């Protein structure tokens, strides 16, 4: 009997997950539940339901009606809504943590307090505030700060000094604005290079992916407003060109400690994907945040590299047997680039047609688009991602860039992601911070 699998979510990340599932040698039957019809996911499915991804009862009802045997929750909102809990209660195992563990993403204040309580390494000096006066006083005390709303923001709510916040007054004003909506986390700003480390987690064991670097800023040269991520790259191996081998080992230890502590704190095993957003500083990796799912775009870099059967990994996650399944990756470099609507993220073009031409060797992942009468249209968020895979980052970048040149519409993209000049800038920055140590030792 072929296994029936339900995928929840309709973005680029979920298109990559759907592809991973469909490439399984066990020929699973895929079903999907998504808010809008993603043409990439729809083409891979036996059947799909268009529904809000946080409608817990409707998701369970659909899963039961289709005799679903296992589910994969892609985005954070359904995890925060308790979709994983409800499906487990209905007897359907889920790749995606229950609400008690997913809180590590959707409540930033809880996450920092949890790290402090369990002595998890890489935690900044921070405080959580609900009132203006003490928050402003703490900004004065720390001087160089990052300001974060406590809840989910789609990667766009955090602002840091010297970047989006030019001075202390700007930091205080932004804090006051956020406090009208809820608690605010104010923490010391780390200086360094960010990287993402993701892992499948079965409650206690972790299977790590290669490190990825995302690019949050909208425009070339790391300028402009924050976005959900304009693109990302991996090297042919575990680490990135600006990292040392010891850096990723430290990050892995932090994530392992986090999984163990989550079980102790919640009494629930974390089963799903854990995403560690790190910043590599002169004194090693520090934790920017944890997310309870794959990154988007980072999923599109790493999922195509998996050589182990994807549905076997899913089964190992829900049965807590990852320790007996070697998860292997092909040693290729990848570059992912997003085409986004003109005006994104502040005033994006909506409902404009996208035409995908000959993308050559690249993979294409549809994100925030919808299909109507055989045509594809933008929704206002990131539209289409392309991924190049090759022996080197440089070769992968050229494959991705060539593909983007053949996608038509009112769109723009960052040409500099994955280029030798931008990567050299990252290497030079880390060398300077470390005091001239050579990279990749």
From Swiss-Prot:
Binds 2 magnesium or manganese ions per subunit. Mn(2+) 1 binds at residues 277, 289. The gene is purD. HAMAP family: GARS. Its cofactor is Mg(2+); Mn(2+). SMART domains: GARS_A, GARS_C. It comes from Methanosarcina acetivorans (strain ATCC 35395 / DSM 2834 / JCM 12185 / C2A). This is Phosphoribosylamine--glycine ligase. One of its GO terms (biological process) is purine nucleobase biosynthetic process.
